[in-house]
């Protein structure tokens, strides 16, 4: 048997062995795949009400899979008995169940407050689950490096990378090969085959790749010497060349550039936009430490030079990055970018100091500090969602009090227009706070301040934006949507007494239009409800609301007939582009010019845009 065939056979043997070695982890991965298959089977109109449930299950099984990996490795490497193995698997399943219960009961958004049709997993809940996955995986790597006689953190760290890329390669080959066969079947035998077949293939390939990943690791049982460990931990010759002769010189060159920038900053001041600087610096700090761990056991001259130079150079560069951070905080206060960069900076400084003091023995401590930072970032008071908002609230309060616009916990419009810098700072803080989620806001703050008219009414001046340092617009990828436009045709409006143009409503600051009828004056409101724009029609007769209806039922009707997809716009008849609403006093027909429903699959966000052409109304 040649080497290539033997390696393939060993990979799949390891995958089957993973079911015995990590049963809870593989079980969670299988459940994850089953949930994915169910989601594939359901179209968006059927899936949308269940989206929150499915996302909770996905996160729960992801946490359970990685937590089980860590728990079983701890049990095997430290105890190696049946009782510890059983407990670790029960803990893994329990972690998945606990994550689901917490996320399902406490991790959802409020549809009414957020303007969504259904609850979604909040960003904070997803971040906490992500932190649990990260911490579990780091703990797995730490304990996979025991005993010290056979391994260490650097070797275990590389082994995890190696297992990942081998599993990724096999998964891509499986998916590509199976998709090719499916494509041949579709082209030659069954042209009506559903496109979902390819999604099922991708799901199965992902599950098999995970089993290959888990099965690649050696026997971690205490007292066992597995010859496979040495092979799994060993860096192939091409990897040594990649790290020592290519990546190390690149990072050393970047180090030189950043050191030159540091010297230039001393002479000419800080001129680089903070967003750009923070991204470069964060990449350098994280990537530099990662590479330092990877070349721990290399004896190449470049690798030895890098291990000596990097900690000192990083300290110098991090000192200047701290200067840039202080300037940014003085100018704009603490926001999510500054918060994230501060955490990375603290971890990086601690890491390079530890590398100088303890050399390669610092790796486990650095990993634990990283775990602490991940947990800290999602804590109730100090997390990314709370601390920046609290900082901006304090900043805004100081600005408003200085202008006499906040007294006794109540806002008051400015009697005189503040100077430009103050208006810019107030606008910047207001918009950041209004856009925040999962954070407690003071009673005096109204989230509608993000609207131009509310802002001017309550603060006494127009929103004034500071000049942006950079403009970074990007779509996270993937498009799924429904786009309809009204077919040119006549509209039967016989029997209706009034025709209301939407421009008449939009042109008024309060989005209100009055119509005089036999029963009295009707007030018509057409509210677009940003950010997700599920429109709401409200009609009042005097002071009484006689009709209040959102477009959820109409959206259900549209998505059932035109499920969101990747195609372009569709022409639709008047029957599809209109909706009739009735109340005891009036009958209303809404006619739309175009409707756009956009789905962001990565974030499970659905936004709606409904362009109203005319509103027709008659008394009953």
Label the predicted regions:
Residues 39-59, 78-84, 106-130, 187-200, ...:
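Membrane-helix interface and helix-disruption motif detector
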Residues 177, 307-358:
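Membrane-embedded alpha-helical segments of integral membrane proteins
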Residues 240, 244, 254-327:
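Hydrophobic alpha-helical segments
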Residues 361-384:
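Internal/C-terminal transmembrane anchor helices
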Residues 407-620:
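Extracytosolic and intramembrane catalytic regions of membrane-associated proteins
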């Amino acid at each position: 048997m040649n080497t290539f065939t033997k390696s393939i056979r060993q990979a799949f043997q390891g995958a089957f062995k993973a079911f015995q070695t990590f049963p809870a982890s593989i079980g969670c991965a299988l459940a994850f795949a089953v949930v994915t298959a169910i989601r594939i089977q359901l179209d968006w109109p059927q899936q949308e009400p269940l989206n929150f449930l499915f996302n909770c299950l996905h996160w729960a099984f992801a946490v359970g899979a990685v937590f089980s990996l860590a728990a079983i490795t701890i049990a095997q490497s430290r105890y190696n008995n049946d009782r510890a193995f059983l407990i670790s698997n029960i803990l893994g399943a329990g972690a998945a169940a606990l994550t689901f219960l917490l996320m399902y009961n406490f991790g959802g958004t409020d549809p009414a407050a957020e303007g969504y049709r259904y609850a979604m997993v909040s960003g904070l809940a997803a971040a906490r689950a992500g932190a649990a996955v990260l911490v579990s995986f780091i703990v797995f790597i730490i304990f996979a490096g025991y005993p010290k006689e056979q391994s260490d953190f650097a070797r275990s760290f590389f082994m995890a990378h190696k297992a990942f890329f081998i599993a990724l390669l096999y998964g891509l080959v499986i998916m590509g090969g199976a998709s090719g066969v499916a494509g041949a079947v579709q082209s030659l035998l069954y042209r009506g085959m559903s496109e979902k077949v390819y999604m099922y293939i991708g799901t199965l390939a992902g599950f098999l790749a995970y089993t290959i990943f888990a099965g690649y690791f050696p026997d971690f049982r205490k007292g066992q010497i597995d010859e496979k460990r040495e092979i799994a931990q060993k860096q192939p010759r091409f990897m040594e060349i990649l790290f020592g002769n290519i990546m190390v010189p690149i990072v050393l060159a970047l180090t030189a550039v950043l050191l030159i920038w540091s010297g230039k900053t001393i002479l000419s001041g800080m001129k680089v936009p903070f967003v750009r600087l923070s991204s470069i610096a964060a990449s350098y700090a994280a990537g530099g430490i990662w590479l330092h761990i990877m070349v721990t056991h290399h004896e190449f001259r470049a690798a030895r030079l890098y291990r000596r130079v990097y900690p000192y150079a990083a300290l110098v560069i991090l000192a200047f990055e701290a200067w840039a951070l202080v300037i940014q905080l003085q100018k704009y206060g603490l926001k999510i970018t500054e918060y994230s960069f501060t955490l990375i900076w603290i971890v990086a400084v601690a890491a390079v100091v530890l590398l100088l003091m303890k050399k390669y023995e610092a790796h486990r401590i650095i990993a634990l500090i990283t775990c602490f930072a991940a947990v800290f970032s999602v804590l109730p008071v100090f997390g990314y969602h709370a601390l920046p908002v609290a900082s901006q609230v304090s900043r805004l309060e100081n600005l408003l009090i200085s202008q006499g616009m906040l007294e006794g916990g109540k806002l008051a419009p400015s009697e005189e227009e503040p100077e430009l810098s103050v208006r810019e700072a107030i606008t910047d803080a207001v918009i950041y706070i209004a856009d925040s989620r999962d954070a407690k806001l003071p009673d005096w703050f109204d989230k509608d301040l993000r609207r131009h008219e509310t802002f001017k009414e309550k603060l006494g001046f127009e929103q004034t934006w500071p000049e942006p340092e950079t403009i970074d617009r990007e779509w996270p990828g993937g498009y799924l949507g429904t786009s309809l436009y009204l077919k040119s045709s006549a509209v039967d409006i016989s029997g209706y007494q009034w025709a209301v143009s939407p421009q008449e409503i939009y042109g008024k600051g309060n989005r209100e239009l009055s119509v005089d009828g036999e029963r009295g004056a009707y007030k018509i409101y057409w509210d677009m409800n940003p950010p997700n724009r599920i429109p709401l029609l409200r009609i009042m007769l005097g002071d009484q609301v006689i009709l209040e209806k959102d477009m959820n039922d109409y959206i259900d009707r549209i998505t059932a007939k035109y499920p969101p997809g990747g195609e372009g716009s569709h022409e639709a008849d008047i029957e599809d582009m209109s909706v009739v609403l009735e109340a005891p006093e009036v009958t209303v027909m809404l006619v739309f010019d175009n409707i756009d429903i956009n789905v962001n699959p990565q974030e499970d966000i659905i936004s709606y845009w409904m362009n109203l052409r005319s509103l027709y109304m008659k008394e009953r």
